[in-house]
């Protein structure tokens, strides 16, 4: 039974899962919109929203906290200085998931995840 189980394992070890979420976040920050599988998009949503909430403060500690998660200077800078200030007056719900198609090779549900404008 999976009662009260708080996250998706995505068929990966914990370190692989952390690296996957970090890389998907960097791709989302750089491009603004990515296509991935639906479970990955749903798991990524919570990860990104916590980062944006932290980045909204915009101070030095916010930069450090975001960089600790992403380990990418360009993505960190873009998230804290460009993306997070757009959501200054918004309490959560910074991303949108749109179901797109069924992938032909393995019939996986695909979805776009993007920032709300």
Curated annotation (Swiss-Prot):
Swiss-Prot/TrEMBL keywords: Ribonucleoprotein, Ribosomal protein
Keyword Ribonucleoprotein carried by entry: yes
Gene Ontology biological process: translation
Cited InterPro entries: Ribosomal_bL17 (IPR000456), Ribosomal_bL17_CS (IPR047859), Ribosomal_bL17_sf (IPR036373)
MF terms (GO), sorted A to Z: structural constituent of ribosome
Pfam families xref list: Ribosomal_L17 (PF01196)
Gene Ontology cellular-component terms listed: cytosolic large ribosomal subunit
Protein family according to the UniProt entry: Belongs to the bacterial ribosomal protein bL17 family.
Subunit structure: Part of the 50S ribosomal subunit. Contacts protein L32.
Protein name: Large ribosomal subunit protein bL17
């Amino acid at each position: 039974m999976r009662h009260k189980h708080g996250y998706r394992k995505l068929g990966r070890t914990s370190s692989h899962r952390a690296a996957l979420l970090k890389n998907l976040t960097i791709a989302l920050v750089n491009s603004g919109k990515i296509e991935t599988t639906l479970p990955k998009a749903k798991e990524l949503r919570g990860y990104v929203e916590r980062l944006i909430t932290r980045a909204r403060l915009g101070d030095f500690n916010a930069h450090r906290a975001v960089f600790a998660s992403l380990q990418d200077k360009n993505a960190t800078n873009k998230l804290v200085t460009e993306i997070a200030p757009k959501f200054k007056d918004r309490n959560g719900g910074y991303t949108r998931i749109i179901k797109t198609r069924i992938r032909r090779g393995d019939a996986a549900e695909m979805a776009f995840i993007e920032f709300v404008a």
